[in-house]
């Protein structure tokens, strides 16, 4: 076809078997691996940020960092918590970070992490899960929409302070 640019599809890693995939609570020693995966995705290493997140979430019953391992290697993470009464919102779950190794994006690893986080949030008693994305974050927008998320009743506003 004239005018069509095509590129070979990226290699696809087979979907992990249930026996090969483990979703578990993060441990403090996972912070460095999460930072490495996040840096691979975002091209920005943030080790101090991840140490702070891991320290802040440690021991809090309504805050969760979940890790996805395939064959014993960290291949994804998701972070969420219950937040209550911000701007009149009843308690709800918030997902504020998710990362999946690029080689594992087409095999439902992100969906399994999302489902596991939603289950944790349900167990905390909330009935809604929310997130916030940059308008141009098409990858995560497509992912969260594929999970059934859609625009909610709140609008985020901001202004520069300089």
For each feature predicted by the language model, list its residue ranges.
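Conserved active-site alpha-helix within GNAT-family acetyltransferase domains
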Residues: 111, 135-153
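Conserved beta-strand-loop-alpha-helix junction that forms the acyl-donor binding cleft
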Residues: 131-140, 158, 162
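A short, internal acetyl-CoA/4′-phosphopantetheine-binding micro-motif in the GNAT/acyltransferase core
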Residues: 97-105
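Conserved acetyl-CoA-binding loop-helix of GNAT-fold acetyltransferases
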Residues: 106-119, 146
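Acetyl-CoA-dependent GNAT
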Residues: 16, 25-28, 36, 40-90, ...
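Conserved GNAT acetyl-CoA-binding A-motif
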Residues: 121-132
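Conserved N-terminal entry element of GNAT/NAT acetyltransferase domains
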Residues: 1-29, 162
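Active-site/acyl-donor-binding loops of N-acyltransferases
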Residues: 2-6, 147-162
């Amino acid at each position: 076809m004239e005018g069509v640019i095509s590129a070979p599809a990226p290699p696809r890693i087979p979907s992990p078997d249930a026996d090969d995939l483990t979703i578990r609570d993060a441990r403090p020693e996972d912070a460095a691996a999460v930072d490495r995966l996040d840096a691979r995705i975002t091209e920005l290493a943030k080790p101090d940020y991840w140490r702070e997140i891991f320290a802040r979430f440690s021991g809090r019953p309504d805050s969760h960092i979940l890790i996805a391992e395939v064959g014993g290697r960290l291949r994804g993470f998701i972070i969420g918590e219950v937040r209550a009464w911000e701007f009149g919102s009843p308690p709800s779950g918030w997902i504020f970070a998710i990362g999946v190794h690029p080689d594992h994006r087409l095999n439902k690893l992100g969906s399994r992490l999302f489902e596991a986080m939603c289950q944790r949030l349900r167990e905390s008693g909330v009935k809604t899960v929310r997130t916030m994305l940059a308008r141009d974050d098409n990858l995560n927008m497509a992912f969260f929409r594929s999970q059934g998320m859609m625009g909610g009743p709140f609008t985020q506003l901001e202004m520069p302070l300089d």
